[in-house]
Amino acid sequence: MIPGEVITPEGDIELNVDRPTLKVSVANTGDRPIQVGSHFHFAEANDALQFDRGLTKGYRLNIAAGTAVRFEPGQSRDVELVALSGKRQVYGFAGRVMGALD
């Protein structure tokens, strides 16, 4: 083994297995691009993004950690979200929850 080396098993690594997911259509109604990161509480994303915020409470993008999705001005796209896990508490972001989700 080389110092710092990471040895993984053969094959693909599946993310978020058996976690609730949902697909939502999102439109950027603003005049600037908007990026949403992998672990951002999606319901609190930029207000220029139009989608059902109530439906997305407690969800984040179902993408690899450290990545983001970019919404260009006027663009609409469908994204897949995955339920937050752990304690299911949300603090910060846009300050709209500041506590337990459930």
UniProtKB/Swiss-Prot annotation:
Claim: NAD is one of the keywords in the record: no
Compartments it resides in: Cytoplasm
Reactions catalysed according to its record: urea + 2 H2O + H(+) = hydrogencarbonate + 2 NH4(+)
Main location class: cytoplasm
A GO cellular component entry from the record: urease complex
Any one GO molecular-function label of the UniProt entry: urease activity
One GO process term, biological-process aspect: urea catabolic process
Source species, domain of life: Bacteria
Entry protein name: Urease subunit beta
Keywords (A to Z) from UniProt: Cytoplasm, Hydrolase
Organism the protein comes from: Acinetobacter baylyi (strain ATCC 33305 / BD413 / ADP1)
NCBIfam families in the record: PRK13203.1 (NF009682), urease_beta (TIGR00192)
Family membership: Belongs to the urease beta subunit family.
Subunit structure: Heterotrimer of UreA (gamma), UreB (beta) and UreC (alpha) subunits. Three heterotrimers associate to form the active enzyme.
Pathway(s) served: Nitrogen metabolism; urea degradation; CO(2) and NH(3) from urea (urease route): step 1/1
EC number in record: 3.5.1.5
